[in-house]
UniProtKB/Swiss-Prot annotation:
Gene Ontology biological-process annotations: DNA recombination; DNA repair; SOS response
PANTHER family with a match to the protein in the record: MITOCHONDRIAL DNA REPAIR PROTEIN RECA HOMOLOG-RELATED, RECA
CDD domains found in the cross-reference section: RecA
Main subcellular location of this protein, as a coarse class: cytoplasm
A GO term from the CC aspect: cytosol
Organism phylogeny: Bacteria, Pseudomonadati, Pseudomonadota, Alphaproteobacteria, Hyphomicrobiales
Name this polypeptide is given: Protein RecA
Record InterPro entries: AAA+_ATPase, DNA_recomb/repair_RecA, DNA_recomb/repair_RecA_CS, P-loop_NTPase, RecA-like_C, RecA-like_N, RecA_ATP-bd, RecA_C_sf
Protein's job: Can catalyze the hydrolysis of ATP in the presence of single-stranded DNA, the ATP-dependent uptake of single-stranded DNA by duplex DNA, and the ATP-dependent hybridization of homologous single-stranded DNAs. It interacts with LexA causing its activation and leading to its autocatalytic cleavage.
Length: 363
C-alpha cells in the first residue's frame, strides 16, 4: 500500500493571529514594566560591535579575538603567585585612562604598589582606590561604583582576599564552610545587570588552590566557589614560563596566557609575551614575535628587518632599536592589527584544546 506524502500547508490566518498575540503580549509587558523592557533585537540600538579595552599586550588582544577585553562584562584573571595577574589588570587600567576612562581599584589584599602602577602608565591622580576591611564592604563599594554609571574599568584584587565579616569576627580556626562562595554568588547576582547597563568592565583577580585527593585531571581550582566561573564572559589563565636574564641578572619573566573561556570570540587560544621587572609588558618584544609570525617582520639568521630596513642582530638588539624608533614600532603595530585574523590563526596553530580546557571553560 503506497503511503501518501504529507504536505505542509501555510495558514496566513494563523500567522496573523500569532502576530496579534505577540503584539498584545509586548504591549502588556511594556505597560507593566516600562518602555524598552522588551523589544525586537534588530529594531533597537542594542545591535553593535563589542566595545573593548586593550590589555596592554598586543598578542593577548589578538588572542581574545575582538581586540581586547569586552566592556560591560565580568572578567576573571587567575594564576599562581607572581605570574603577572595584577600587572595585566593595571595595564588594562592604563589603556582605559588613555582613552579618558575613569577607573577604580578595590585593593582587598592591601598590596597595591603605586610606584609600580605609575611605571606601567597608570595615572594615580585619577585612579580611585579602596582598601576595604571585609568582603561585604568590598563588594558593596563595587556595586555602588558600578551603579553610578561613571566607571569604565573596576578591578577587584583579589577574590581570595574577600574575607566574610563572620570569619573576621570569629576565632582563628573556626570552621565556616561556604561563606565566601555564598558571598560571591549573591554579589554577582546583584552586579551582573548593573555591569551590563553601565557598560563597566569588572575584572576579578583570583588565586588558585589545590583540591585534595584528586586522582585524575587537574587538581587546581580557583577560590570563591563556582559562581564567578559562570558569570565571567572571559577567563584568563596566566602562568610564568621562564625567567629572562641579562647575563646572570634576572630582568623579567616570560608568561603564557590561555583564554580558558570566551563568550565574545572562540576560546582556547594562548599567547606568550615578556613582562619586564619595573616596566610591565614588553610591547616591542611582542611586535617582533607577532611580526615574524605574520610575515611582517623578516628574520634571516639572527637578523630582524622590516620594510628592507634592518632592526638589529638578535632579539634584544631589535627590541632596543624599536624602543628608540617609536614611529617604526607604530607602523609595525598598525600592520599587525590590520592582519589580526592571520596572526590569530598563527596563534591558534599552537593551541590545541585539551580535556582540561573544556572542564575549565564549560561554565
Amino acid at each position: 500500500m503506497a503511503q501518501s506524502s504529507l504536505r505542509l500547508v501555510e495558514n496566513p490566518t494563523m500567522d496573523k493571529d500569532k502576530s496579534k498575540a505577540i503584539d498584545a503580549a509586548l504591549a502588556q509587558i511594556e505597560r507593566a514594566f516600562g518602555k524598552g523592557s522588551i523589544m525586537r533585537l534588530g529594531k533597537g540600538d542594542k545591535v553593535q560591535e563589542v566595545e573593548t579595552i586593550s590589555t596592554g599586550s598586543l598578542g593577548l588582544d589578538v588572542a581574545l579575538g575582538v581586540g581586547g577585553l569586552p566592556r560591560g562584562r565580568v572578567i576573571e584573571i587567575y594564576g599562581p603567585e607572581s605570574s603577572g595577574k595584577t600587572t595585566l589588570a593595571l595595564h588594562t587600567i592604563a589603556e582605559a585612562q588613555k582613552k579618558g576612562g575613569v577607573c577604580a581599584f578595590v585593593d582587598a589584599e592591601h598590596a597595591l604598589d603605586p610606584v609600580y602602577a605609575r611605571k606601567l602608565g597608570v595615572n594615580l591622580d585619577d585612579l580611585l582606590i579602596s582598601q576595604p576591611d571585609t568582603g561585604e564592604q568590598a563588594l558593596e563599594i563595587t556595586d555602588t561604583l558600578v551603579r553610578s554609571g561613571a566607571i569604565d574599568v573596576l578591578v577587584v584584587d583579589s577574590v581570595a582576599a574577600l574575607t566574610p565579616r563572620a570569619e573576621i569576627e570569629g576565632e582563628m580556626g573556626d570552621q565556616q564552610p561556604g561563606l565566601q562562595a555564598r558571598l560571591m554568588s549573591q554579589a554577582l547576582r546583584k552586579l551582573t545587570g548593573s555591569i551590563s547597563r553601565s557598560n563597566c568592565m569588572v575584572i576579578f583577580i583570583n588565586q588558585i588552590r589545590m583540591k585534595i585527593g584528586v586522582m585524575y585531571g587537574s587538581p587546581e581550582t580557583t577560590t570563591g566557589g563556582n559562581a564567578l566561573k559562570f558569570y565571567a564572559s572571559v577567563r584568563l589563565d596566566i602562568r610564568r614560563v621562564s625567567t629572562l636574564k641579562d647575563r646572570d641578572e634576572p630582568i623579567g619573566n616570560s608568561v603564557r596566557v590561555k583564554v580558558v573561556k570566551n563568550k565574545v570570540a572562540p576560546p582556547f587560544k594562548q599567547v606568550e609575551f615578556d613582562i619586564m621587572f619595573g616596566e610591565g609588558v614588553s610591547k616591542v618584544g611582542e611586535l617582533i614575535d607577532l611580526g615574524v609570525k605574520a610575515g611582517i617582520v623578516e628574520k634571516s639568521g639572527a637578523w630582524f628587518s622590516y620594510d628592507s630596513q634592518r632592526l638589529g642582530q638578535g632579539r634584544e638588539n631589535a627590541k632596543g632599536f624599536l624602543r628608540d624608533n617609536p614611529d617604526i614600532a607604530g607602523r609595525i603595530e598598525a600592520a599587525i592589527r590590520q592582519n589580526m585574523g592571520l596572526v590569530a590563526d598563527k596563534i591558534l596553530e599552537n593551541a590545541v584544546p585539551t580535556a582540561e580546557d573544556f572542564d575549565e571553560g564549560e561554565a
